Amino acid sequence: MLCCTDESKTNKITILWEDIIMSKLRVWWIPQIGINEIFYVPVNTPEEGKKLLDTLAAYDAFQLQNNVKSDCFNVGGLQMFDEEDEDWYDWNVETDNYFYDDLDEYCKSEDCEQAEELENFQKEVFKQIDWSKIPD
Protein backbone atom coordinates (compact mmCIF):
# COMPACT_ATOMS: atom_id res chain seq x y z
CA MET A 1 0.00 0.00 0.00
CA LEU A 2 1.22 3.50 -0.74
CA CYS A 3 1.91 5.76 2.20
CA CYS A 4 -0.29 8.71 2.90
CA THR A 5 -0.95 11.17 5.70
CA ASP A 6 -4.63 11.74 4.97
CA GLU A 7 -7.21 8.99 5.56
CA SER A 8 -9.30 10.05 2.54
CA LYS A 9 -6.23 9.79 0.32
CA THR A 10 -5.46 6.34 1.67
CA ASN A 11 -8.71 4.86 0.38
CA LYS A 12 -8.29 6.16 -3.17
CA ILE A 13 -4.61 5.26 -3.36
CA THR A 14 -5.21 1.81 -1.88
CA ILE A 15 -7.79 1.00 -4.53
CA LEU A 16 -5.48 2.11 -7.32
CA TRP A 17 -2.54 0.30 -5.77
CA GLU A 18 -4.55 -2.93 -5.39
CA ASP A 19 -5.52 -2.69 -9.06
CA ILE A 20 -1.84 -2.58 -9.96
CA ILE A 21 -0.87 -5.42 -7.62
CA MET A 22 -3.72 -7.52 -9.01
CA SER A 23 -2.55 -6.83 -12.55
CA LYS A 24 0.31 -8.72 -14.06
CA LEU A 25 3.60 -6.86 -14.39
CA ARG A 26 6.64 -7.62 -16.46
CA VAL A 27 9.95 -6.00 -17.31
CA TRP A 28 10.91 -5.91 -20.96
CA TRP A 29 14.53 -5.55 -22.03
CA ILE A 30 16.27 -5.25 -25.37
CA PRO A 31 20.00 -5.68 -24.66
CA GLN A 32 20.99 -4.42 -28.10
CA ILE A 33 18.72 -2.22 -30.21
CA GLY A 34 18.29 -3.84 -33.57
CA ILE A 35 17.71 -7.41 -32.42
CA ASN A 36 14.27 -8.81 -33.14
CA GLU A 37 13.60 -10.43 -29.78
CA ILE A 38 12.57 -8.90 -26.46
CA PHE A 39 13.58 -10.41 -23.10
CA TYR A 40 10.64 -10.50 -20.62
CA VAL A 41 10.77 -11.10 -16.85
CA PRO A 42 7.62 -11.22 -14.69
CA VAL A 43 7.75 -9.08 -11.54
CA ASN A 44 5.37 -8.64 -8.61
CA THR A 45 5.64 -4.89 -7.97
CA PRO A 46 6.84 -1.74 -9.72
CA GLU A 47 9.67 -1.52 -7.18
CA GLU A 48 10.83 -5.04 -8.05
CA GLY A 49 10.71 -4.02 -11.71
CA LYS A 50 12.84 -0.94 -10.95
CA LYS A 51 15.49 -3.07 -9.26
CA LEU A 52 15.58 -5.49 -12.18
CA LEU A 53 15.84 -2.68 -14.76
CA ASP A 54 18.70 -1.08 -12.80
CA THR A 55 20.44 -4.45 -12.57
CA LEU A 56 20.10 -5.13 -16.30
CA ALA A 57 21.36 -1.63 -17.19
CA ALA A 58 24.33 -1.92 -14.82
CA TYR A 59 25.17 -5.40 -16.14
CA ASP A 60 25.20 -4.16 -19.74
CA ALA A 61 27.40 -1.20 -18.73
CA PHE A 62 29.71 -3.55 -16.78
CA GLN A 63 30.12 -5.76 -19.85
CA LEU A 64 30.84 -2.71 -21.99
CA GLN A 65 33.44 -1.28 -19.62
CA ASN A 66 35.20 -4.67 -19.47
CA ASN A 67 35.19 -5.19 -23.24
CA VAL A 68 32.74 -8.09 -23.17
CA LYS A 69 30.53 -6.10 -25.54
CA SER A 70 31.87 -3.78 -28.20
CA ASP A 71 28.92 -1.42 -27.94
CA CYS A 72 25.70 -1.18 -26.01
CA PHE A 73 22.46 0.42 -27.12
CA ASN A 74 19.86 -1.07 -24.79
CA VAL A 75 16.34 -0.14 -23.80
CA GLY A 76 13.80 -1.48 -21.33
CA GLY A 77 10.72 -0.72 -19.31
CA LEU A 78 7.85 -1.98 -17.20
CA GLN A 79 4.52 -3.14 -18.60
CA MET A 80 1.23 -4.09 -16.99
CA PHE A 81 -1.33 -6.52 -18.36
CA ASP A 82 -4.86 -5.22 -18.86
CA GLU A 83 -7.14 -8.21 -18.37
CA GLU A 84 -10.07 -6.40 -19.96
CA ASP A 85 -8.18 -5.69 -23.21
CA GLU A 86 -6.01 -8.81 -22.82
CA ASP A 87 -2.95 -6.82 -23.83
CA TRP A 88 0.23 -5.36 -22.34
CA TYR A 89 0.63 -1.60 -21.85
CA ASP A 90 3.36 0.65 -20.52
CA TRP A 91 3.11 0.88 -16.74
CA ASN A 92 1.52 3.88 -15.04
CA VAL A 93 -0.06 4.69 -11.69
CA GLU A 94 -2.23 7.52 -10.44
CA THR A 95 -2.21 8.84 -6.89
CA ASP A 96 -4.05 11.80 -5.39
CA ASN A 97 -0.88 13.81 -5.92
CA TYR A 98 0.28 12.82 -9.36
CA PHE A 99 -0.01 10.62 -12.43
CA TYR A 100 3.19 8.63 -12.96
CA ASP A 101 4.12 7.08 -16.28
CA ASP A 102 7.85 7.18 -15.54
CA LEU A 103 8.97 4.41 -13.18
CA ASP A 104 12.13 6.26 -12.12
CA GLU A 105 10.12 9.36 -11.25
CA TYR A 106 7.63 7.33 -9.22
CA CYS A 107 10.37 5.43 -7.37
CA LYS A 108 11.97 8.73 -6.28
CA SER A 109 8.68 10.25 -5.12
CA GLU A 110 7.04 10.50 -1.70
CA ASP A 111 4.36 8.14 -3.03
CA CYS A 112 6.86 5.26 -3.17
CA GLU A 113 7.36 3.67 0.25
CA GLN A 114 10.62 2.08 -0.90
CA ALA A 115 12.16 5.23 -2.44
CA GLU A 116 15.17 5.30 -0.09
CA GLU A 117 15.82 1.55 -0.43
CA LEU A 118 15.62 1.79 -4.23
CA GLU A 119 17.99 4.76 -4.32
CA ASN A 120 20.50 2.87 -2.15
CA PHE A 121 20.16 -0.22 -4.35
CA GLN A 122 20.76 1.82 -7.50
CA LYS A 123 23.85 3.48 -5.99
CA GLU A 124 25.22 0.10 -4.90
CA VAL A 125 24.73 -1.48 -8.32
CA PHE A 126 26.02 1.45 -10.38
CA LYS A 127 29.06 2.20 -8.21
CA GLN A 128 30.66 -0.81 -9.91
CA ILE A 129 30.65 1.04 -13.22
CA ASP A 130 33.55 3.25 -14.24
CA TRP A 131 31.68 5.59 -16.56
CA SER A 132 34.98 7.02 -17.87
CA LYS A 133 35.56 3.64 -19.57
CA ILE A 134 32.20 3.78 -21.35
CA PRO A 135 32.50 5.33 -24.83
CA ASP A 136 30.16 8.20 -25.68
PLM feature spans:
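Acidic, low-complexity, intrinsically disordered interaction modules
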Residues: 52-112
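Short, Lys/Arg-enriched N-terminal segments with co-localized hydrophobic residues
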Residues: 2-21
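Short aromatic-glycine-(Arg/Gly/Cys) micro-motifs in beta-strand/loop hairpins
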Residues: 21-36
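Secreted/extracellular small peptides and ectodomain modules produced from precursors
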Residues: 1-2, 70
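A short, exposed loop/beta-hairpin motif centered on an aromatic-Gly-Thr core
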Residues: 36-47
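Acidic surface patches and DE-rich sequence motifs
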Residues: 6-8, 31, 82-86
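Short acidic DE-rich linear segments
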Residues: 133-136
